[in-house]
Amino acid sequence: MSDAMRAETVMIEGHQGDQIEAYAARPIADTPVGGVVVIHHMPGYDQATKEMVRRFAANGYAAVCPNLYWRDAPGASPDDAAAVVRAGGGVPQDRLLGDLAGAAAYLRSQPNSNGKAGIIGHCSGGRQAFLAACLLDFDAAVDCYGAFVAAPPPPGLPIAMEPLLPLADGLSCPLLGLFGADDKNPPPSETEILDAELTRLGKTFEFHTYEGAGHAFFAVDRPSYRPEAAVDGWRRIFDWYGRYLAK
C-alpha cells in the first residue's frame, strides 16, 4: 500500500450549516476507502492532532479533524483558543454534535468514500467520541481514555458535563476502548462500570487496559508517553477500523 496522500486545511459544513475550519488528509488512490473523524483533545486543534489525521491517511483512510473552537477564536493558537473555550464553559453539546455530524458527512461525500465513517478521540475527545457514537450515525468508534463517561466530574471543573452512561443503550456502532491502569481520569473502576453496562446491553465492544500506563500514554511529546502501550494501541485501532470500516 502506498502512503501517498493529500493533506490540507479545508472548510466544511458544521452545526446549523456554519462553515468551520478542518484539517483533512486522504490517500491518493482510486479504490474506495473508509473515513475517520478525529476529535482533537481539550488543548485544542494542534499539530499532534493533525499528525494523527495524516497517520490515518498513510494507512489507507480518509480522515478529518474539525476545529471545534473555530467560532470562539478563529485564527488563534491552540492554547489561546482552548483557554477561551474553557473560560466560556466548553463547547455546547448540540454544536459539538452538529460539527461531528458535518465532519462525517464531509467524509462520506468524497468521491473515493466507501460510505463508512468511524470516529476517534483522546482524553476529552474520547468522551466525545463515545457521545457521538451514541447519538450519531457512525460505523465504528474508538475511545482513548475518555473520562466522565460512567462517573460525574469532580466539583469545580470549568467545563460543565454529565455522565454519559444513560446514553449507552443508544450506542450505534462497535466501540474500542483503550485505557491506562494508572489513569485517574478515567480510573479502572470507571471503565469497569462502562464495561458492565455495555455487556448488559449486548453491545459490540472491546476494552483494553495497559499496565504501567496512565493518562495520555499515546502522546509522544509528553512524559506520560508509554511506547509499548501506544504501539499496541495503534495496532488495535487499525485492526478495529480494518474490521468495521473496510468493504
Language-model-detected regions and their locations in the chain:
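N-terminal cap/leader regions of alpha/beta-hydrolase-fold enzymes
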Residues: 1-247
